[in-house]
């Protein structure tokens, strides 16, 4: 029985054009994201088999595989909803996302400073990775994380609310080796309503985290 399932896209393949082509969206969701879902489910089965047989020789690889595939599934599930064909601009109070706008200004000094930091974090990933805006519960502030692969270089307890996929499969068919151009273009499809909802949800869960005895 599968624990994880591939979510449906919240729009059709052409919804984000011309920023992201229909071909990329279809391949990215139906093949790449699906592979992470399958990988997570397969690894859970392999871990269950290892427990049943008490054979732990491959535990290091299995735990690493689970982190890789599960994190890939989670980040992509956020990624699809973080984008919309009528998005872009910046979060503004008049659009009902004023609290997010205030949090960005408090955490980064200005929206321009935040945009520059997240753009640079995503565009300068070495190899495969992500640029992520995350809520950090200890300080109650927003931070930018530069994630290696899907799971490395992450602050424990942080919650991703806006993710930029910097893996080549996210852009190469359209942007070739111009990762910076892709990241710059991504700002035109950011769904600030979705990011704001994730910010509010992340804040509301802070009190349930046992951060200290």
Swiss-Prot record:
Claim: NAD is one of the keywords in the record: no
Localization in the cell: Cytoplasm
Annotated InterPro entries: Fe/Mn_Superoxide_Dismutase (IPR050265), Mn/Fe_SOD (IPR001189), Mn/Fe_SOD_BS (IPR019833), Mn/Fe_SOD_C (IPR019832), Mn/Fe_SOD_N (IPR019831), Mn/Fe_SOD_N_sf (IPR036324), SOD_C_sf (IPR036314)
EC number: 1.15.1.1
Record text on cofactor binding: Binds 1 Fe(3+) or Zn(2+) ion per subunit.
Coiled-coil spans in chain: none
Inducing or repressing factors: Inhibited by nickel.
Gene behind the chain: sodF1
Protein name from the UniProt record: Superoxide dismutase [Fe-Zn] 1
Source taxonomy: Bacteria, Bacillati, Actinomycetota, Actinomycetes, Kitasatosporales
């Amino acid at each position: 029985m599968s624990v994880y399932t591939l979510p449906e896209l919240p729009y059709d393949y052409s919804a984000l054009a011309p920023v992201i082509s229909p071909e990329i969206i279809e391949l990215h969701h139906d093949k790449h994201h699906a592979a992470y879902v399958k990988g997570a489910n397969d690894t859970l089965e392999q871990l269950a088999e290892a427990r049943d047989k008490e054979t732990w020789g491959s535990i290091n690889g299995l735990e690493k595989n689970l982190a890789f595939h599960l994190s890939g599934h989670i980040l992509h599930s956020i990624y699809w909803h973080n984008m919309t064909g009528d998005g872009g601009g910046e979060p503004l109070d008049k659009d009902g996302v004023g609290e997010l706008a205030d949090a960005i200004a408090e955490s980064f000094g200005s929206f321009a400073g935040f945009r520059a930091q997240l753009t640079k974090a995503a565009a300068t990933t070495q190899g495969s990775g992500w640029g992520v805006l995350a809520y950090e519960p200890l300080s109650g502030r927003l931070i930018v994380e530069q994630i290696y692969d899907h799971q490395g270089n992450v602050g424990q307890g942080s919650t991703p609310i806006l993710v930029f996929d910097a893996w080549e499969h996210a852009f190469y068919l359209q942007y070739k080796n111009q990762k910076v151009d892709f990241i710059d273009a991504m700002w035109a499809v950011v769904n600030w309503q979705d990011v704001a909802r994730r910010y509010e949800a992340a804040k509301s869960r802070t009190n349930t985290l046992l951060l200290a005895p």
